[in-house]
């Protein structure tokens, strides 16, 4: 399970955090009493009030002045309810971020026209990564803070409140100091993480600091204590301006105007990636949204766009090769694992190595935190099960089929001419086996004729109750005439069912189909092989394709048009583009011996599996001239098998000589024997014998049409299809998205093991821990409730986006009321409650997400790069929208929208100063002695983390002092 491991420094910091509000609360009680005695009138400004105001949704808990015990009870209820609401917001934000991931993963197809006129298609993402991070991604991670500010203003008659703005500033401080401090510390010792897109980081950091400086300017400089309409609107419009500036920096549009850009397809899912290059020498066109754009003429995207098609193909091939390499390594590392487990491991490894968005890490952190399990491992396991199930499709008749199916066991049968009879098996599957089923059969001529080649047969087969298999026999007529192989057909027809329910025992034809019918195959083909010829020897086909993963390839050599006598057929392999000697296949040669009446033999060749994604190599398998085994050779072979005789290759008196070996290790004088032929070769032949010899010559074995088989070794179909499926399924939007409500409800009620993300492999399935069960049961209400949110599959994620943000708004309204009532119950001001408790609660999922991103990602962008952008968006959207609405409302009524500059202006100024220190330290850490913003030597990590935690504690400390008038603000 993912845990937030904190150093002693962090532990001390959080203990101080809990102590500070209580300290000031106690001090304020004393000062409040003193001021009341001295008729002070500033207690409302400088102390927390114990009198609560009606919330946007929640009413006031009466009576307003409870006893000390009741205050503790009320504070506990408010605090627990607030924490539970934070859990709910985290879970619905998980759905919200899933929809954002799906939306920003949308692609469009473009057509590339090559110089030779050929066209090819590829896909590009619609959303720019930087734009999506600053808009939808930032909105997703900061939605509670933004909505809290808007709801607070709108819910309190468009008057300014402390909770929303203070939450935004407090959340920004927590993100800037605590989250970055944690990310610096959790990177393993000696490792570093750098920000990849430094230009974008500079722009967003500058805008983040400017955003809070701008708040100070409009509150304390331009129009102190009043927010005018143009100030609110300009604050809001800074948001799209910030996005444009970040996009310009990302695209290098201002600084690299005249640097020609070259575009190639990325390794992940055919995405187009930009890199700088020389002016193109050839003309390339690209079609987007149905229009062909000539990059040489139109200077597409402020640079000459060159879509290097060859390089794109190479990168696609490289991605597949990488996937194939991973599968091969896993197979070698885990030879005992099944294909499902190997696919799961490969899928998880590829997804783990893939660059991930901020949304993904936020979703992953929330699900691990709430007992929903590791989404990467769950997705990998699901895909593996689906992939294996695709290979295990069973086409047989289901046993629970209500209709009985009657069919032949196989569609083709073979027999020799001298076999006497051929047996055909009829099967019965499914339906009610207590019924009696009748089925008619009859033979039909093919190339074989009834009466001369086989016996015409017809009849009825009866399946009694419980019987599932029957056998019928057809007589085969033998003759001594050389003839081609012939065939005839056997048909099934007229299925009838008998049951006790029917009056006459036989059901009517129009009722039979509901109980029994013919299955497939209902016709069998019987081939009769002639046995009067020694045979024609051939391969089944001239070319065969085999998978390199086949291992031992077996090739059939057929003996047609006769099967009389013993025949030896030599064979050998011949190299083509495939090499023998164990490189692509093992060289094979030998002889096949067909016994009398034997019609099929197999040749085995070992194919070497080197698991290439694409392979197309050939070799040949050739059979030589067949020869009849003469009587002497036949006897020698028999003696060799039984008694250890070998052929010497010598002749005595015209007869072959055989040597019997008594012992191989200690030879003794051998015995030489001769076997005389039954006939004398020198004796003249009679006319009858001459005719017999002529007939015998006609019946000698010969080669058929296909004597040289071309074997094409291809990549393993299973291996290739597995790689292709993994390539298609490595889209993170598919991992975090959902397709149906059923899937969402199953996921909501299922508790999964939250395994450590440090694991490189899935390993064996683990059971959920006690912590997983506790968190699951604490959050199961929210999980089931938010399972009603539309799946991300609908409207390309927009349906889920809209419903989720409405849900977040409702929960945020409850959180605002609970936080305000909690603060007033214990005497804390809203500004302090917001900075400490609400900001912490809304930032916990981001803390987990950044921790995971810091340890898993190659760069620091996903962990801290979005912090600065998110802070700027919080101000421009959260405060800009809320204050614009309120300023317009008051201006329409002829009033001014007044905002007290004191606490907020002080907090903003303090945060801005500390933020400069934070960014300066991060940039200094890029020096070679440390190597990056995150990680580095242990001493440097500790010093940096301690400094950032100290900055945050100082921010909380001074903000609280100012809020309670212990120091003077602005």
UniProtKB/Swiss-Prot annotation:
Q: Where is the signal peptide, in residue numbers?
A: 1-32
Q: Enumerate the residues binding Ca(2+) 4.
A: 453, 479, 483, 486
Record-listed Ca(2+) 1 binding positions: 417, 453, 479, 483
Q: Phosphoserine (modified residue): where?
A: 282, 389
Which reaction(s) does the protein catalyse, per the Swiss-Prot or TrEMBL entry? Ca(2+)(in) + 3 Na(+)(out) = Ca(2+)(out) + 3 Na(+)(in)
Q: Quote a single Gene Ontology cellular component term.
A: axon
Which residues does the entry place in the Cytoplasmic compartment? 93-133, 189-201, 250-797, 843-871, 925-941
What regulation of activity is recorded for this protein?
Activated by micromolar levels of Ca(2+).
Q: Which keywords does this Swiss-Prot/TrEMBL entry list?
A: Antiport, Calcium, Calcium transport, Calmodulin-binding, Cell membrane, Glycoprotein, Ion transport, Membrane, Metal-binding, Phosphoprotein, Repeat, Signal, Sodium, Sodium transport, Transmembrane, Transmembrane helix, Transport
User: Which residue windows are coiled coil?
Assistant: none
Could you tell me where this protein is found in the cell?
Answer: Cell membrane
Gene Ontology molecular functions: calcium ion binding; calcium:sodium antiporter activity; calmodulin binding
Extract the ranges annotated as region (Putative calmodulin-binding region).
251-270
Q: Where are the Alpha- repeats?
A: 138-178, 839-875
Residues involved in Ca(2+) 5 binding: 548, 610, 612, 715
Residues that bind Ca(2+) 6: 584, 610-612
Instruction: Offer one example of a GO biological process linked to this entry.
Output: calcium ion import across plasma membrane
Tissue-specific expression: Detected in heart (at protein level). Detected in heart.
Q: Which residues form the Calx-beta domain?
A: 393-493, 524-624
The way this protein sits in the membrane is described as: Multi-pass membrane protein
What PANTHER family does the annotation carry?
SODIUM/CALCIUM EXCHANGER (PTHR11878), SODIUM_CALCIUM EXCHANGER 1 (PTHR11878:SF6)
Its name, as the record gives it, is: Sodium/calcium exchanger 1
State the organism named in the record: Felis catus (Cat)
Gene (UniProt): SLC8A1
């Amino acid at each position: 399970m993912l845990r937030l491991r904190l150093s002693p420094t962090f532990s001390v910091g959080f203990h101080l955090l809990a102590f500070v509000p209580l300290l000031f609360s106690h001090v304020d009680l004393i000062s409040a009493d003193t001021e009341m005695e001295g008729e002070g009138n500033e207690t409302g400004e400088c102390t927390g009030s114990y009198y609560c105001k009606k919330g946007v949704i929640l009413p006031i808990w009466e009576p307003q002045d409870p006893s000390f015990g009741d205050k503790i009870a009320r504070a506990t209820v408010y605090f627990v309810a607030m924490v539970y609401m934070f859990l709910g917001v985290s879970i619905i934000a998980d759905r919200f971020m899933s929809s954002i991931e799906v939306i920003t993963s949308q692609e469009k197809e473009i057509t590339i026209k090559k110089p030779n006129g050929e066209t090819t298609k590829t896909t590009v993402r619609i959303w720019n990564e930087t734009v999506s991070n600053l808009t939808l991604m930032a909105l997703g991670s900061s939605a509670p803070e933004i909505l809290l500010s808007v709801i607070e203003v709108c819910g309190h008659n468009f008057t300014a409140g402390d909770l929303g703005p203070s939450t935004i500033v407090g959340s920004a401080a927590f993100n800037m100091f605590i989250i970055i401090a944690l990310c610096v510390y959790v990177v393993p010792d000696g490792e570093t993480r750098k920000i990849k897109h430094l230009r974008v980081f500079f722009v967003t950091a500058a805008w983040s600091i400017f955003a809070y400086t701008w708040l100070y300017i409009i509150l304390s400089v331009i129009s102190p204590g009043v927010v005018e309409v143009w100030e609110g609107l300009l604050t809001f419009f800074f948001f799209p301006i910030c996005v444009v500036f970040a996009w310009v920096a990302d695209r290098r549009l201002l600084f690299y105007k005249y640097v020609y850009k070259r575009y190639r397809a990325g390794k992940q899912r055919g995405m187009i990636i930009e890199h700088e290059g020389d002016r193109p020498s050839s003309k390339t066109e690209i079609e987007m949204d149905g229009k062909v754009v000539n990059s040489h003429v139109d200077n597409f995207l402020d640079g000459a766009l060159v879509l290097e098609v060859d390089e794109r193909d190479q990168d696609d091939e490289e991605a597949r090769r990488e996937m194939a390499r991973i599968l091969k390594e896993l197979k070698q590392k885990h030879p005992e694992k099944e294909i499902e487990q190997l696919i799961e491991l490969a899928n998880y490894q590829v997804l783990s190595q893939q660059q991930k968005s901020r949304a993904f890490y936020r979703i992953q952190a929330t699900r691990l935190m709430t007992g929903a399990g590791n989404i990467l491992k769950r997705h990998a396991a699901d895909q593996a099960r689906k992939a294996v199930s695709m290979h295990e499709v069973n086409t047989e008749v289901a046993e629970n089929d209500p209709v009985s199916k009657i069919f032949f066991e196989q569609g083709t049968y073979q027999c020799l001419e001298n076999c006497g009879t051929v047996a055909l098996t009829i099967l019965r599957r499914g339906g009610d086996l207590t019924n009696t089923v009748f089925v008619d059969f009859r033979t039909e001529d093919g190339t074989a004729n009834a009466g001369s080649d086989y016996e015409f047969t017809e009849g009825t087969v009866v399946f009694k109750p419980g019987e599932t298999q029957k056998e019928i026999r057809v007589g085969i007529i033998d003759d001594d005439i050389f003839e081609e192989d012939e065939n005839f057909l056997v048909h099934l027809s007229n299925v009838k069912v008998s049951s006790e329910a029917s009056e006459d025992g036989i059901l009517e034809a129009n009722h039979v189909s509901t109980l029994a019918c013919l299955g497939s195959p209902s016709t069998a083909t019987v081939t009769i092989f002639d046995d009067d010829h020694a045979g024609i020897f051939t391969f089944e086909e001239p070319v065969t394709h085999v998978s390199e993963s086949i291992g031992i390839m077996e090739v059939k050599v057929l003996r047609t048009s006769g099967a009389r006598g013993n025949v030896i057929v030599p064979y050998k392999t011949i190299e083509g583009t495939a090499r023998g000697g164990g490189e692509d296949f093992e060289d094979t040669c030998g002889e096949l011996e067909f016994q009398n009446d034997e019609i099929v033999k197999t040749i085995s060749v070992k194919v070497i599996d080197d698991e290439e994604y694409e392979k197309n190599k050939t070799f040949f398998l050739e059979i030589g001239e067949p020869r009849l085994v003469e009587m002497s050779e036949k006897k020698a072979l028999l003696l060799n098998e039984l008694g250890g005789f070998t052929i010497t290759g010598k002749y005595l008196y015209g007869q072959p000589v055989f040597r019997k070996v008594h012992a191989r290790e200690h030879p003794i004088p051998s015995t030489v024997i001769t076997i005389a032929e039954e006939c004398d070769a020198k004796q003249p032949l009679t006319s009858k014998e001459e005719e017999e010899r002529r007939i015998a010559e006609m019946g000698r074995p010969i080669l058929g049409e296909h004597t040289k088989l071309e074997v094409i070794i291809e990549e393993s179909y299973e291996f290739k299809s597995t790689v292709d499926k993994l390539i298609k399924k490595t889209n993170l939007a598919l991992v975090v998205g959902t397709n149906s409500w059923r899937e969402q409800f199953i996921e909501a009620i299922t508790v999964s093991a939250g395994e450590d993300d440090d694991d490189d492999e899935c390993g064996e399935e683990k059971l959920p821990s006690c912590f997983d069960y506790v968190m699951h049961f604490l959050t199961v209400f929210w999980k089931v409730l938010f399972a009603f949110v539309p799946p991300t599959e609908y409207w390309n994620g927009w349906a889920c986006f809209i419903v989720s943000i409405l849900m977040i708004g409702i929960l945020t309204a409850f959180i605002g009321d609970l936080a305000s009532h909690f603060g007033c119950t214990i005497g804390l001001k809203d500004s302090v409650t917001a900075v400490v408790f609400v900001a912490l609660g809304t930032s916990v999922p981001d803390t987990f997400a950044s921790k995971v991103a810091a340890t898993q990602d190659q760069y620091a962008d996903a962990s801290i790069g979005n912090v600065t952008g998110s802070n700027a968006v919080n101000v421009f959207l959260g405060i800009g929208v809320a204050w614009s609405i309120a300023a317009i409302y008051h201006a329409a009524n002829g009033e001014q929208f007044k905002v007290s500059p004191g606490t907020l202006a002080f907090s903003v100024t303090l945060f801005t100063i500390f933020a400069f220190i934070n960014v300066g330290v991060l940039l200094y850490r890029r020096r070679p002695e440390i190597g990056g913003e995150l990680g580095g030597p242990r001493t440097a990590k500790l010093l940096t983390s301690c400094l950032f935690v100290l900055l945050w504690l100082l921010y909380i400390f001074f903000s609280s002092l100012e809020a309670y008038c212990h120091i003077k603000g602005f």
